[in-house]
């Protein structure tokens, strides 16, 4: 949730952020009105409770003659307190709903517009010409790396088996990501992939895109689409010690997405699937350190992309393509030869204090006063990377060269057709 103090002092900035996102700026006024009504209801209820307490003391000290009138007045006050408290509950609910409806305030410099309106930050490497390139599905099946047909037979569309060297390639990629993270001071976590509603909602995944999330109704638990979710909840309700710098975690987990809004998109292969594995970087830090930390996460992502030796670009994602929690997001997109396009491999988001405010994650400032922390996240490796590796490293004879950094994990330098 956004900072109320910032909203009250800078309503025009929040309206401008809403417009940049393509969202309704009128929601700002709705929240301001709800905030005013809530504060008024709290004040009224507090005043009446104080009067009720004073009246009770008078009854205790009253003479027999005074008592009936005072009891009648106390009874009337009790009814007023009950009514005021009910109104407070109503206004609190309306305020919470209005507060949750407003997305994070975008950081200055984020480009306006939608998916295609990103700003290009950097191009790394040149796509090398490949005569009659095969796509990752044809390569993967000819090399015995994955089995789409049996995945669909067992689980349905957008499921797959990774087999043989395909499984080793993914495991090697994820292990390399873990090694990179640990070498840079991250603590490795293997988190639960089922979380409570308050954790899923606290990270911002139960808003406009709630239909993308798998929900186990009987248990009221959600399957996570990224380990960002359980790691964001790891310190919920806690006060952190950030005096020695940010807390950095790397989460290795399976991830689950319904892909409800992607009908007809990327139906072939493993680019857009219901289940995949990922190593995610997650950082808690002081708000003033968040932008520098964002650049560091991007640097670690670029280090991983360097290991797989593929051409890629770095983009500053436009405001209209940001998730509700992100104030800024950088994507690294790798070149996919058969699509003649760059496709997202990593994403790193600066969520400022938005998630931590919902999840009550705080730290103590220099005076010892608790303050809301900032959170950031970023992809260090995921299943989709196999697409870029296979297509960019394919050879004329149908084999695929294994990136040098992955050879120790895979156990061979070249994947040969079966």
Curated annotation (Swiss-Prot):
Sequence positions that bind L-serine: 226-228, 280, 379
Subunit-level organization: Homodimer. The tRNA molecule binds across the dimer.
Entries under HAMAP family matching the protein: Ser_tRNA_synth_type1
Family to which the UniProt record says this protein belongs: Belongs to the class-II aminoacyl-tRNA synthetase family. Type-1 seryl-tRNA synthetase subfamily.
InterPro entries, per the entry: aa-tRNA-synt_IIb, aa-tRNA-synth_II, aa-tRNA-synth_II/BPL/LPL, Ser-tRNA-ligase_type_1, Ser-tRNA-synth_1_N, SerRS_1_N_sf, SerRS_core, tRNA-bd_arm
Catalytic activity: tRNA(Ser) + L-serine + ATP = L-seryl-tRNA(Ser) + AMP + diphosphate + H(+); tRNA(Sec) + L-serine + ATP = L-seryl-tRNA(Sec) + AMP + diphosphate + H(+)
Alphabetized GO MF terms: ATP binding; serine-tRNA ligase activity
Pathway: Aminoacyl-tRNA biosynthesis; selenocysteinyl-tRNA(Sec) biosynthesis; L-seryl-tRNA(Sec) from L-serine and tRNA(Sec): step 1/1
Keywords, sorted A to Z: Aminoacyl-tRNA synthetase, ATP-binding, Cytoplasm, Ligase, Nucleotide-binding, Protein biosynthesis
Function statement: Catalyzes the attachment of serine to tRNA(Ser). Is also able to aminoacylate tRNA(Sec) with serine, to form the misacylated tRNA L-seryl-tRNA(Sec), which will be further converted into selenocysteinyl-tRNA(Sec).
UniProt domain comment: Consists of two distinct domains, a catalytic core and a N-terminal extension that is involved in tRNA binding.
Main location: cytoplasm
Enzyme class, UniProt record, top EC level: ligase
EC number(s) reported in the record: 6.1.1.11
Name of this protein: Serine--tRNA ligase
Annotated ATP binding sites: 257-259, 273, 344-347
Compartments it resides in: Cytoplasm
Any GO CC annotation of this UniProt entry: cytoplasm
Biological process, per Gene Ontology: selenocysteine biosynthetic process; seryl-tRNA aminoacylation
Organism: Mycobacteroides abscessus (strain ATCC 19977 / DSM 44196 / CCUG 20993 / CIP 104536 / JCM 13569 / NCTC 13031 / TMC 1543 / L948) (Mycobacterium abscessus)
């Amino acid at each position: 949730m956004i900072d109320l103090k910032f909203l009250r002092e800078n309503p025009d900035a929040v309206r401008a952020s809403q417009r940049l996102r393509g969202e309704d700026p009128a929601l700002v006024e709705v929240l301001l009105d709800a905030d005013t009504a809530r504060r008024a209801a709290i004040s009224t209820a507090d005043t009446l409770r104080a009067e009720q307490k004073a009246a009770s003391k008078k009854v205790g000290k009253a003479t027999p003659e005074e008592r009936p009138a005072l009891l009648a007045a106390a009874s009337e006050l009790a009814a007023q307190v009950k009514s005021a408290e009910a109104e407070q509950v109503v206004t609190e609910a309306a305020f919470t709903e209005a507060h949750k409806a407003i997305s994070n305030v975008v950081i200055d410099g984020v480009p306006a517009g939608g998916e295609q309106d990103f700003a290009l930050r950097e191009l790394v490497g040149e796509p090398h010409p490949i005569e009659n390139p095969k796509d990752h599905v044809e390569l993967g099946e000819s090399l015995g790396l994955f089995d789409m047909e049996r995945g669909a037979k067992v689980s349905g569309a957008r499921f797959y088996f990774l087999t043989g060297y395909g499984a080793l390639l993914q495991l090697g990629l994820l292990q390399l990501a873990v090694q990179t993270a640990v070498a840079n001071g991250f603590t490795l976590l293997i988190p639960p992939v089922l979380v409570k509603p308050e954790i899923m909602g606290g990270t911002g995944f139960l808003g406009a895109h709630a239909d993308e999330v798998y929900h186990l109704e009987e248990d009221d638990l959600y399957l996570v689409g990224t380990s960002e979710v359980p790691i964001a909840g790891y310190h919920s309700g806690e006060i952190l010690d950030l005096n020695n710098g940010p807390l950095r975690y790397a989460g290795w987990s399976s991830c689950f997405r319904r892909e409800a809004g992607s009908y007809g998109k990327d139906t072939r292969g493993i680019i857009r699937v219901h289940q995949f594995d990922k190593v995610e970087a997650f950082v808690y830090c002081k708000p003033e350190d968040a932008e520098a930390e964002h650049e560091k996460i991007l640097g670690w992502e670029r280090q991983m992309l360097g290991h797989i030796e593929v051409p890629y670009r770095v983009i500053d994602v436009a405001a209209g393509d940001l998730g509700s929690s992100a104030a800024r997001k950088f994507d690294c997109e790798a070149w996919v030869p058969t699509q003649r396009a760059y496709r997202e491999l990593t994403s790193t988001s600066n969520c400022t204090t938005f998630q931590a405010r919902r999840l009550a994650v705080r730290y103590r400032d220099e005076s010892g006063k608790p303050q809301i922390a900032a959170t950031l996240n970023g992809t260090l490796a995921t299943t989709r990377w196999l697409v870029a590796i296979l297509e960019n490293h394919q050879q004329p004879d149908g084999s695929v060269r294994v990136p040098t950094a992955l050879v120790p994990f895979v156990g061979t330098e070249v994947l040969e057709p079966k």
